[in-house]
Amino acid sequence: MVKLRLKRCGKKQRAVYRIVAIDVRSRREGRDLWKVGFYDPINNKTYLDIPGILYFLEKGAQPTGTVYDILKKAGVFTEFSLNQMEVN
């Protein structure tokens, strides 16, 4: 199973996170399948690869709690529901 998860990078006391699609059995810093975004909590900046995120959500990937909140704030789930309606 694939999850959309935060992967920590950056310096000590200056963490930034990549939003990655990763196998559920992998470690937090393990090998990811795809980098789909970037989140900087200090400057409150977010960069998202919306088509990549939608691709993994359509394939059944589950976002973690924090990633879910980030995606919800960015409005990704409204686009996801629109894509689901078009397919059905």
Swiss-Prot record:
GO biological process, one term: mitochondrial translation
Keyword Electron transport in record: no
Keyword Chloroplast appears in the UniProt entry: yes
Gene Ontology molecular function terms on file: structural constituent of ribosome
Keywords: Chloroplast, Plastid, Ribonucleoprotein, Ribosomal protein
A Pfam family per the record: Ribosomal_S16
GO cellular component: chloroplast; mitochondrion; small ribosomal subunit
Compartments where found: Plastid, Chloroplast
Family note: Belongs to the bacterial ribosomal protein bS16 family.
NCBIfam families named among the record's database cross-references: S16
Protein name from the UniProt record: Small ribosomal subunit protein bS16c
